Curated annotation (Swiss-Prot):
Protein's name according to its UniProt entry: Transcription termination factor 2, mitochondrial
Domain of life: Eukaryota
GO MF annotation: an example: double-stranded DNA binding
A biological process term (GO) from this entry: termination of mitochondrial transcription
Pfam family, one: mTERF
Tissue expression: Expressed in skeletal muscle, heart, liver and pancreas.
Keywords attached to this entry: Mitochondrion, Mitochondrion nucleoid, Transcription, Transcription regulation, Transit peptide
Species, as recorded: Homo sapiens
GO CC aspect terms: mitochondrial matrix; mitochondrial nucleoid; mitochondrion
Function: Binds mitochondrial DNA and plays a role in the regulation of transcription of mitochondrial mRNA and rRNA species.
Matches recorded under Gene3D superfamilies: Transcription termination factor 3, mitochondrial
Presequence extent in this chain: 1-35
Subunit structure: Monomer.
Amino acid sequence: MLWKLLLRSQSCRLCSFRKMRSPPKYRPFLACFTYTTDKQSSKENTRTVEKLYKCSVDIRKIRRLKGWVLLEDETYVEEIANILQELGADETAVASILERCPEAIVCSPTAVNTQRKLWQLVCKNEEELIKLIEQFPESFFTIKDQENQKLNVQFFQELGLKNVVISRLLTAAPNVFHNPVEKNKQMVRILQESYLDVGGSEANMKVWLLKLLSQNPFILLNSPTAIKETLEFLQEQGFTSFEILQLLSKLKGFLFQLCPRSIQNSISFSKNAFKCTDHDLKQLVLKCPALLYYSVPVLEERMQGLLREGISIAQIRETPMVLELTPQIVQYRIRKLNSSGYRIKDGHLANLNGSKKEFEANFGKIQAKKVRPLFNPVAPLNVEE
């Protein structure tokens, strides 16, 4: 999942917005800022500014984010606001949407209504739609390739993706929907063939594909050549078809985002760090595919973090999945385990490993053992009379 995008304020660039005489050498910055803002304001479309004020929009935010929209001759402030209100947005929500996505006011109402109908194909009702727009206004107001978007939505529905997943993809990976639908179909065929070629079954392939697309839709932006090169490289490294299938099942489409060079670098680093044979390394990778996925700098940082905590290479090799944890998470968990008297460097890393939920469950068991009484309080005592 995955798969959440923001714009940076560029207010300081206002001073260079248009050519003007240079201010005095020691002129205060604030004076320069005010001067250029006034100059920009004189070129703004006053009708646009007035209509935005009526919608309770903070014009200063728009000037900082995308002041160019205020210079446009043709804008549709009232029309866009009306469409949002028809969907159920109140005045505060409308103002927030326009402040965060100012380019909405230069979208034609006709195009926005078409976009509205398109998104309604995957939303249960208008209430759900307006919530999505409030959360991801930029994705909604990226008005282009609408016919492609519609065809791609229909294609994903035919594949079996649920509407709730498609709506999430529309907001998180809009570029996928701007792809020609034939390109997405080609990529899906390549993924299906790749799964079957390494021994996957037809029955499992559909489940795998749907999980892959819901967790990593950006795979569709890859090229078929890159996918084939990755699989061929793994085979050259001695991985059998069954082992590659295991990696595909665990890493989903993330495996296809790796290039042979990055895989080779990660393999070389792990082999050197663990001082192991090619066969042993393959077993480590199958236990922890992150050894392939993470870059060398990330693996090195995480391994050094574990070593600083007194954990040995032998312990890491026994439980390599611990490398999936960031150094910050490792430090927090070790401190928590130490507070219960559990010394991680003398024990097994399984208690350190796992998701947050799994760790808390293990920690609870350790605490329970610590406070457990040495005798059964309900058992009868053998007392001599």
